[in-house]
Amino acid sequence: MRWRLLYGLMMTIMFFSHTVVAALPTWERPAFIENAFFHVALEYEFTSTTAPRLAKWSHPIRVWFRHDVGHQALHEEMARLHLAHLAQLTHLPITVVARRADANFIWYFTRQSEWQKIIRTELGEKALNNIYGSVCMFGVKLDPDSHEIRRATVIIPVDQARSHGKLLGCIIEESTQALGLFNDSEQAYPSIFNDKTPDDFLSPLDIILLKLLYEPTLTSGMSPSVLQPLLQQLLLQYQQQGKLKQALYQSRHAPIVEQFGR
């Protein structure tokens, strides 16, 4: 089977009435959320496309961890806490398996001296063109017909991530992006997908984007023109049901936040 490979990375960049809408935080406005969704879910870092399509998982995710460095229990605890939160938000079955052969989501905790070799092996030679200034990386393989995500890889060089104060950020951002929110964009704020956001944890906007992505009415392969009316309908429902406001609580009380704090 042919695969389409997409990859992304964390960069070290330092740096409806009108009355009701005006009173809302920017991230809570439906039009802002819709725009952010299109920029984050329908565009790809380092890969251009003239026919963007939605991509998501439709099968259970089975994660296998490869540890090349110490503090294995701590690193895996962080990852498992975040994976549990992702499963809760998306309703995807996400489990950890003991054998690589049983996994469709490979997660490396490695060292900087090894990560280029791992990237070359797992993501291909071309992925090495985009590592300048990066801290960690993810890649996914898509079914070319359905556009469903079939496999994913997360690669975190722990020493490099720690030196930038980004270990938690790498764990959260790369695994979240590997679910289908591939692109970093300044159109999303506050968000882990915006390098100007100071917080490494999922924001309320991120939670809404994840929930939208895994709504059953949105399916892999959908084009922007098909998605737009469905998104608008969902956002109206979210607003009426209080889901937009609930996202703030879910962000503040994420398992990894309660364990490791902001």
Question: Model-derived features: where do they sit?
Answer:
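Metzincin-family zinc-dependent endopeptidase catalytic domain
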Residues: V69, H75-I172, Q177-A178, F182-E186
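Disordered inhibitory propeptide/activation segment of secreted metzincin zinc metalloprotease zymogens
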Residues: V21-R62, V69-H71, V135-L142, L248, ...
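N-terminal signal peptide c-region/cleavage motif recognized by signal peptidases
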Residues: S17-T19
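Bacterial N-terminal signal peptides that target proteins for export
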Residues: M1-G8
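Hydrophobic helical h-region of N-terminal Sec-dependent signal peptides
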Residues: M10-F15
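Metalloprotease/metallohydrolase-associated module, dominated by Zn2+-dependent proteases
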Residues: T47, K126-K166, F182-R262
